[in-house]
Amino acid sequence: RSCYGKRSWLAGCDVSNAFFCFPCLLFQSVGTEVLWTTTGVRDLKHLSEKCKRHESSRSHLDNSMKLTFFGRVSIAEQLDEGYRIGIRRHNEEVTKHRHILSTIIDRVKFCGAFELALRGHDESESSDNPGMFRGWVDFAASLDGALKEHLDRATVFKGTSKTIQNELLDCMLSVTREQIIKEVQTSDFLSIQADETTDIATQPQLLLVLRYIDAKNNVQERFFEFIPLQSATAESVATALKGRLATVLPEDQKSKLICQAYDGATTSAVQRKIQDVYPNAHYIHCYAHQLNLIMQQATSHISKVRIFFSNIGGFSSFFSKSPKRTCFLDEVVAHRLPRSGTVRWNFHSRAISTVFEHRDDLIRCFESIQDSGDFDPNTVREAGALAMLLEDQDFKFFLELYHHITPHVDFLCAKLQEKNIDSVHIKGSIRQFQQEIQKIRNSLHSIGEQSSGSRPTKRRRALSPEDRERIAAEVCDTILGHTRERFSFADHLVCATLLQGDRFEEYKDTFPEDALSSTMKAYPMLSGSKLKTELSLIYSKEEFKACRGAVDLFQLFMENNLEEVFSETVTLLKVVITTPMTTAEAERCFSTSKRIKTFLRNPVTQERLNALAMLSMEKRLVTEMTDFNQRVIEKFAGQNERRATFMFK
């Protein structure tokens, strides 16, 4: 490799096991040595001496010059004064155009980073409200004479049209993705998070987030893409995912993918299809996915359940729109319970429990709103609909059913976040959860009796008690099956306990053999004997007991160049940090998927959604890429036949 680095003309042949001269092979001018074009040099002992003699020969210099000027303007033309002046003027024009384009790129970046609308309703010259982007460009022109002159006089390329904006957004997205792929391919491990969402046209799409440790030893969760889906089936999701992963990980890096996490209802079939191609990609429950919402999604294939959750969301919507409505509800409760403190209404994360526990208060509140005469017609109409809903037998049945189920889901989630966790603890918590759900399933008849005891409403035909029990049994069975699939692999939680500083004192006396065994089973790329030796040394040192978590320990090793000394521990730390597992360690929890879902709630256009989301979510990455604008310009200039010139000669 050092020979090739020193001499760019040197070429090797693995068939003849000899060295040749590439320029001489191509052109073979008069006097070219046969040794370097036909026979080849095999004498490694005297290779350096032969190379020095050959590169000093006239024929080699002639051939090298021919290769250099191959496909270029002739030497005579390049030496012509008129040609030189033309080149200089062309490059001056390119410099000017690149400056203008870079200024426009900066404005697009700003609007994207702060989620501002690029375009207004009227972007004509005389418009008083041309939009944020055009306004920024006009403001920049007032400070930049070159930009102002360009906007006033340009006829070929102005840079402010919708077409140019879209092309720039595409180029910016491409450059940022290329950077993310480069970071992933230089990292040791990769995890993916894929969440099912829908766009404003209700078309299914997949949100893909990549998690890895970058070259600066910082854990990153990067937005990568909204992948459009043909349908929300497992086959469609798996096909789309495998297609994107193939662009991120080449064939020889498939073992890097160590984790996959999903929040949709088709996860079990998807994860098996992905693991067929990426065998190390364990399916886990991700900290970014709320377990209660996942259980809701898992049962949403049942139409009655889907209707119930749509209805329960109506209470949150009703009270979040107006503080006046919430105050009125407080007054109703205060009148009934004058000595009680203020109730903390939570119609979001605890909507089911809140509605179940205060059902009578809510009915009284809605009826009072209808009778008071102090509310607008929309409020009165919505209050009447919600009051009828609270009297509906089917709604009451599912309200009570999920009121019994959700506390156990919350309890399981809390247990899995505890620090003092082991395989026995995990299996015990999951077994206890399954037993509680089974108890609810076995007592469905009592739930049905309570909900059917009240007067029926005339809204629509209610389900029979038998139908309710059948649907509730299906709900319980679905939750039990989903729990088995989601937590079938939990060794990642166990292996994380090997690196908890507050347990090092305990491990010093009794080494955690079971946890090590589970770790080796889950991640066979580790060397068990060396890992045990390294961990034993870490546990015995007082200095390491101040470690607050895996990220702290990893940073300590990397900052002090200990990655070779503690090679297996560092590898384990990379696995643990890259895996988006449920943990109390804040440094490992910064949900990109939640930020993206918040971004989707903003009034953002679907056109160029991927590019706008990338500029918003990855604005720090874009800022850190010092050559970002130049890379965008190069890509923009090479896309089409541009009438304006952007490439130097």
What are these regions (language model features)?
Residues 1-649:
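Alpha-helical structural modules in large enzymes and assemblies
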